[in-house]
Amino acid sequence: MARRIWHAPVAEKGAADPARLVSSALDGHIPCIVITSTPESMTQTHTTDLLVIGAGPAGYTAAIYAARANLKPILVAGLQPGGQLMITTDVENYPGFARGIQGPELMEQMAAQAAHVGTQIIHDIITECTLKGHGGAGEPFRLVGDSGDVYLARSVVIATGAQAKWLGIPGEAQYQGSGVSACATCDGFFYRGRTVAVIGGGNTAVEEALYLTHHAEHVILIHRRDSLRAEKILQDRLFAHPKITVKWNCVVDEIVATGTPPVVTGLNLRDISSGTNEHLAVDGVFVAIGHAPNTAVFKDQVETDDEGYIVTNPGGTRTSVPGVFAAGDVQDRIYRQAVTAAGTGCMAALEAERYLAGMSH
């Protein structure tokens, strides 16, 4: 993969002008970010006070604060710039947008703001890193991109996010944003008075089902076994709730949608005990089989918990390695919201600034 650098629209003399990108964004006209490739043979070494890894709300916010602190940050965008919000349609719970905003549009505006204040945004994927024993007054942290580029940084913010686990069934990817979701907190509002299904049997599924009762008229929990894995107290709440029913020993073979544009209208189920098939009419489906943090490249470099989430100090973003900070869903196994991710991105940048200031004295 060639390295790619994100550019703002080009001014008449050929110079990149991030201010024009932001001005256009603020006017409500969100431009595409032009991506140009660099030949594989032209690898580079980038040196910075702060390297931000990840281009979601946490990463962009960290970059904005770092740039305003004159840390001249470099942001490595990763495989999916914009993160999970790039597959989210209406975002109605992010402050500042009275009528809501499209997920991709929100991320375009964040990218524009980060570029405007001086962040260098590079489209690359970190594939190797050396964090232990580096940073601070010693050798800089060394990271390598898929492009072959080397990144040397005095401090690092890891904001690579997490991904919802999916079933991989027909209709699931196709109808995301049209009735298929993995976040009840994000999308439950759209199903007021409707019937929705939740797929899963652990804490995540039960919590999603309970949350959805605040909006939906009927919530159907679908589980492939005859008992739940969720904590007993959550199960008690689930079974006692009049809006919730459970379909046991069932798997979803297909998510069905109709209309133009298509919206989810039902699920094709299969009873794994009897082998019988059933069509279940629903207005939406929430896949709740857990999340997986994007931390594979940092394994054995920073401390992680049993699910792979990066461990940070209570109430902060410091990791087990001084000078390395973590923000957003990569260290948040509870909230997983755009606004909380942005908040921890701010915290990480402020903590990195203080860390670097301490190194200079």
Which sequence ranges carry the predicted segments?
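Beta1-alpha1 glycine-rich phosphate/pyrophosphate-binding loop at the start
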Residues: 44-117, 206-232, 239, 305, ...
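A Rossmann-like FAD-binding core segment of flavoenzymes
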Residues: 46, 114-145, 150-153, 213-314, ...
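Residue-level detector of alpha-helix initiation sites
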Residues: 56-57, 80, 162-164, 203-204, ...
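FAD-site-proximal beta/loop scaffold in flavoenzymes
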Residues: 163, 168, 174-190, 288-335, ...
